[in-house]
Each structure stands twice: as structure tokens, then as C-alpha cells.
């Protein structure tokens, strides 16, 4: 009985298969017929269009169509890169600092020469420089003033407004769209920057830095959308941004990132991995009088008419020029005391960070008002951003750290630690709660 049922089912399946084949042939013939009909109609339509055009040569529409067809093809002019005519090479450190201080003064801000040297050394030596502070402390305007002082603001400065919800590098560098077969630009200003630097490197005419400002950079986790560039922090001399279609942009250390971040609870934390690679400058609060009077205004300041060359900036402020120098023993002892103290708070200062501090100091000591001031800037911007802990024991560690800073005339660092202690809530202490 079961065998008979199986045989019946097989026969039924065979009949259905034959029917499917017959249906398939029927549909195939129908499709072929439709294709033939389409070709016939299409040919007839083309014939009628040609006949109509022949009989209506004087009509306005035909004249327009013919004129368009007879127009010569436009010649596409290649964008030939040329050398900068306003490039400034014969300038020394004092002159650059004087220009910077003047631009700040024009904007209603006063900075010391030490501050000016600090900004310049930080930007030249580091791949990304972070300006941290409360909203309204002038972080963004400071970055714009730096670009204007160096003559970069009009053509070699891109301001990127970071938004919430950025989750990958696509939000910054764009992506290849397989439907349009084109690179979709999510940040046009940055895409323009990459194209320009790629062309300059291909033609070997890189003459000036290009500053990219990530404004309110921690509205989204930086490590997510900046992942393409995190790799190049140690050696930015050959950077590559690649897309899935094989297209890529290549450029070098002329690209410098600036970032502004706010101290509040609505932003993403900076990871230890990022802090190990970045240089963080803490911004002092702006006085109420200055804010109310509206004296601070970077928009009234014009871009410097001359562009300070990349070669000049590197020759003056880069650490490679002092790589054979060594930190003096007194300064090394001071630094070692700070590093050892940080270990008590659970913070191991990496070899990378120590190298960055050393590089900064060896250049800064030549220009700043004292060796102590040079070391003070380095510690406050490379070591203190690591501060993040809680409890009575951590408070004792911070008090001890502040004492060491005071004993070694590291006044800026001592002041920062003091503010961290003052602003703590529920015995939670963080550099980014200043």
C-alpha cells in the first residue's frame, strides 16, 4: 500500500514538472513576442521622429536641438596646481609669535608669549591637539585665530561640526556608493581637504599645513568616527584613506587636526587610548566682563596675508631638530617624580607619552620664560588629562600630586589639580570636570 502511494506521488510530480516546463515555454514565447513588438514600436517611433524633424527644420524646437547637437564639445580644463605666491619662509620664531599675539589682540584676547609658543609647538609636533573647557571659553575662536595668524584660514582650514550619532569613519570621510558608483561625501569640506592634499602630494608641491577643526568633537565618541586616523598618530608622514572601489587619497604630516571638547555630562568620554595619542590644552574660563562687553570676536580679524610655510614651522618648532639633545638631569628628576606619583593613583604613563613630553620640552625650553614653565605646560597637557578616579584614597593621591607640583614650581599643573579637588562631586575627581 505504501509503495503504491509513493508511485502515485512520483507520477503526480512528473506530470506537474511537465506542466511547469510547458508553462515555461509558453511564458518564454510570450516574452520573445513582447520584445519583438517593443523593437518594432521603437523603430517606428524613431522613423517618425526623423520624418518629423525633416519636415520641421524651421521650427524653434528643432533649431534648438540642432544648435545643441552642433555645439563644440567643452574642453575640460585641468586643475593645474601652482606654487603659493604668498608663502612666507624667511621668518623666525619671534616674528611668528608676534603675529599670533597681534591677531589675538585684534579679537579682544590677550595671551602671553609662553601661551603663543605653547600653541605653536603643540600643533606642529602633534597630529591632533585638543582644546578642552566649558562652553563659551573661546575654544573654537582660538582655533580660527591660530589659522588666521598662520595665513591658513581662507584656503587651508576646514571646520567640521561634529554631530551626535556619528558611529564610524563614514561620517567623516564618506563612503563608496555602489548604486551611483561614486564616493558619497558626508563632510564636503573634509573631502575637499583630502582631494587637495592628495593632488599636492602627487605633484610634490606640499608647501603649507592644512588645519582641520573637529568642533565639539566629543558629541560622538572620537575613536569611532576618527578611526581612520588614529593609526597615524605615531607616524603621519604617509596617510591613506581608502574606499571599497579601490579609490584612495594619500597625504602626509601637513594635515593637522584640532579638536574642541566641552566639559559637561552630555558628551562622550575620551578613552585612555585616545588620550595617550592626543595633546590636551585646558582652556581657562573667560571673565564675565569680557563676555558681557562682547569684546571677544574672532570674526573681525582678517586672515594673515602671508602663509607661514610648513618647512619653516617644522624647522622652528618640530622636535626632529633637537633629537640629539637630552633633558637636563634636574628636569628629568622632576618629571620622574610626577610619573612615579601618577602610578600611585593607578595611572601608568606610557612610553609614547613620555616621548611626546620630552620632544615638547626640548623645543619649548629654548623659547619659554623658564625651564620650569616649559615642563609645566607639558605635564599639564599630557599627564594631568589622565586624572580620573574616586574615593578618599584618590583624593590623598591628588593632594600629594599637587604638593609635588608646587615644590617643583609647576604652578599651572598645581592650579589644575587644585581645581579638580575643588570641583569634585561625591568624591569623584576628573580632569574633564574642570
Regions found by a protein language model. Give the residues of each.
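C-terminal regulatory/interaction module of P-loop NTP-utilizing enzymes
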Residues: 1-434
